[in-house]
Amino acid sequence: MNDYHLEDTTSELEALRLENAQLREQLAKREDSSRDYPLSLEEYQRYGRQMIVEETGGVAGQVKLKNTRVLVVGAGGLGCPALPYLAGAGVGQIGIVDNDVVETSNLHRQVLHDSSRVGMLKCESARQYITKLNPHINVVTYPVRLNSSNAFDIFKGYNYILDCTDSPLTRYLVSDVAVNLGITVVSASGLGTEGQLTILNFNNIGPCYRCFYPTPPPPNAVTSCQEGGVIGPCIGLVGTMMAVETLKLILGIYTNENFSPFLMLYSGFPQQSLRTFKMRGRQEKCLCCGKNRTITKEAIEKGEINYELFCGARNYNVCEPDERISVDAFQRIYKDDEFLAKHIFLDVRPSHHYEISHFPEAVNIPIKNLRDMNGDLKKLQEKLPSVEKDSNIVILCRYGNDSQLATRLLKDKFGFSNVRDVRGGYFKYIDDIDQTIPKY
């Protein structure tokens, strides 16, 4: 049996299994209807250990969970732990927004996915996982990129939103739309060994994201998981805490009387710590939830709120075409026996990236260190004794972004004239030239 037929048969078996579970559920409901139980007998067994916890409110609390609709924006490092716990707890409808696909580099932290699903849409992979976990729930997927045009249509009808995204732009959009629709948001982020979590727009009286952050961080201060890395269990713990906070919201643990805005900070290394800080409430001058707000549904949908312009973006395209070379051109000069005699080969990735995998001929000077030299040639010569103003310098980084910035530094600050960066960087070289080099 070939792979195609095997995959087809597996899908058919999965569909039959789900259909069987749904039929059993319908039968159980009919059998229980005469007794007027709010849950099926199987649901009593499934959620029993949860219902006997006094704080959940017993059967009434479980019915609340069953009647609640939660939207999870992002099925990555935060969404992956949050989704199965929400499904396992019995949240009746779960929506998943994500247009990304599963990649091998995701799997160390996004443990809801697995190796067999590489290339599959994350929202579909998540749907398959949580419907296997709990066939009593309804799961809706949105394989689209969230934007000003579709956010209102996607959000409406949901009681709570989990913001599991990794960019300030999307966080502002999620918060703005939620405020306009009167939806409470559980928002979190994580990077490296740390994470943070908060609740926004609680019952339309709590602060929104703009109350906390009226202006976004500068683009060069924002680091993604791809750039900064992340420890799986650390972000997983934050995602699990998001599920806890969502259950507390649904079960009425938080009330208008006892809720106080907070920011929870988690750090996994060197010793684990969890701190909670009291945050300020709604701000009267907030453009989204304040008295004279201008960020309305109409303004967002018409595109009058330019999130890209507001949050900014790092401009990496700072080199002229003749200051860049392709990986093919680099390969030709790299294979020249006199390469090192004619060129200085500089790798500007962070040192711990360089240690994972590098060209043996490359000298590692992270771009941060180059910046700190502030154009001082003597400081550069301490690292590169052979470098002179007329040296031919070839610069490499991970993706071909920092190498452009380094090219500008060496030309504009240090006064070098013969500097070129490798377009696409180290990873482009691996993809196009030599797949035997480790790619991380």
UniProtKB/Swiss-Prot annotation:
Domain Rhodanese residues, every copy: 339-438
Higher taxonomy: Eukaryota, Fungi, Dikarya, Ascomycota, Saccharomycotina
Localization of this protein: Cytoplasm, Cytosol
Gene3D superfamilies reported in the protein's UniProt record: NAD(P)-binding Rossmann-like Domain, Rhodanese-like domain
PANTHER family with a match to the protein in the record: ADENYLYLTRANSFERASE AND SULFURTRANSFERASE MOCS3, UBIQUITIN-ACTIVATING ENZYME E1
Family recorded in the similarity comment: In the N-terminal section; belongs to the HesA/MoeB/ThiF family. UBA4 subfamily.
Biological or metabolic pathway of the protein: tRNA modification; 5-methoxycarbonylmethyl-2-thiouridine-tRNA biosynthesis
Chief localization: cytoplasm
Membrane-spanning parts: none
Modified residues (Phosphoserine): 326
GO BP, sorted A to Z: protein urmylation; tRNA wobble position uridine thiolation
Any single GO CC term annotated in Swiss-Prot or TrEMBL for this entry: cytosol
Listed name of the protein: Adenylyltransferase and sulfurtransferase UBA4
Positions of the catalytic residues: 225, 397
Protein EC: 2.7.7.-, 2.8.1.-
Residues the entry annotates as binding ATP: 77, 98, 105-109, 122, 166-167
Domain of life: Eukaryota
